[in-house]
Structure formats: structure tokens, C-alpha cells
């Protein structure tokens, strides 16, 4: 009894050709010679000349599908996009500028032979930036950080 892909059991019966009843009593042996020779065996003339599958009937083909081995499929290579590269470069430059920006450092002055007393005085804060200043006095955190950096210059 064989099981097909469905859950219902099926019976497969192979019909073997039945030999014609013999008139010689006793066990029947093969029709070949008793001693092995290289001579070809004579073909029986009684066999009908037809298709060999016609005598067996219609035999079902096996439904096993042979899939190829599992192969890792590779995606096609993307073409380089110059717009993406430029955007990445721009974002990298902006990120580096933000990362390395120093707050509270005055802009570098042009080099002069003799410094004036007016150039040593702190530059006044522009009126445009003043509304954005939300604290009236400098924070203690900024002072603590500057003193720490003066005491430990190799920390950063």
C-alpha cells in the first residue's frame, strides 16, 4: 500500500504478464541454454510486435519535481548615483563643522604689528543675537568646563 500526496491511501498493482500454461509437468526453468555461451538467444516469434507499454497499460508518471540546488541569488549591482554621493559629502561636511564648532570664541582678528587697547576689549554682542540669549548670566557649567580644560589640556 502506498501513500500518494493526498491523505487517501491508494493501492498500486503491477500486472505481470502471465505465462501460457505449459504441458510439461514439473518446475519450469528459463528457456535459455543450460550452459552459458556467447551466442544470442533466439527471440520468441509468438510475441506481438507492438509498443511495449501497451501491454502494461497506462502507468502514471511520478510527480516528483527536481528543483535545482539552493543557490544564493545575487542582487544586481546598483549604479552609482552622483546626487547621492554629493548629498552624503555635504552632510559629512556639515556634521564635521557642527562637531568642531567652538562656542564663545571670538572671530580671529587680522594680524597687526601693534595691538591697540581697543582690540583687546571684548567685542560687543550684536543686537540680532541678543534676543536668542535666554539666560541673563553665564552658566556655571560653561565656567566649570573651561577651568577643567585649562587644568587638563590632554583630556580632549
Curated annotation (Swiss-Prot):
Sequence intervals crossing the membrane: 83-99
Biological process according to GO: anatomical structure morphogenesis; apoptotic process; DNA damage response; glycolytic process; intrinsic apoptotic signaling pathway in response to DNA damage; mitotic G2 DNA damage checkpoint signaling; negative regulation of apoptotic process; negative regulation of glycolytic process
Induction: By radiation, 12-O-tetradecanoyl phorbol-13 acetate (TPA), okadaic acid, TNF and NUPR1.
Subcellular location: Membrane
Assigned GO CC terms: cytosol; membrane; mitochondrion; nucleus
Keywords of the record: Glycoprotein, Membrane, Phosphoprotein, Signal-anchor, Transmembrane, Transmembrane helix
Topological region Extracellular: 100-156
PTM notes: Phosphorylated at Thr-18, Thr-123 and Ser-126 by MAPK1/ERK2 and probably MAPK3/ERK1. Upon phosphorylation by MAPK1/ERK2 and MAPK3/ERK1, acquires the ability to inhibit cell death induced by various stimuli. Glycosylated.
Glycosylation sites: 133
Comp. bias intervals (Low complexity): 44-55
Annotated function: May play a role in the ERK signaling pathway by inhibiting the dephosphorylation of ERK by phosphatase PP2A-PPP2R5C holoenzyme. Also acts as an ERK downstream effector mediating survival. As a member of the NUPR1/RELB/IER3 survival pathway, may provide pancreatic ductal adenocarcinoma with remarkable resistance to cell stress, such as starvation or gemcitabine treatment.
Family designation: Belongs to the IER3 family.
Subunit structure: Interacts with the PPP2R5C-PP2A holoenzyme and ERK kinases; regulates ERK dephosphorylation.
Protein name: Radiation-inducible immediate-early gene IEX-1
Source organism of the structure: Homo sapiens
Lineage: Eukaryota, Metazoa, Chordata, Craniata, Vertebrata
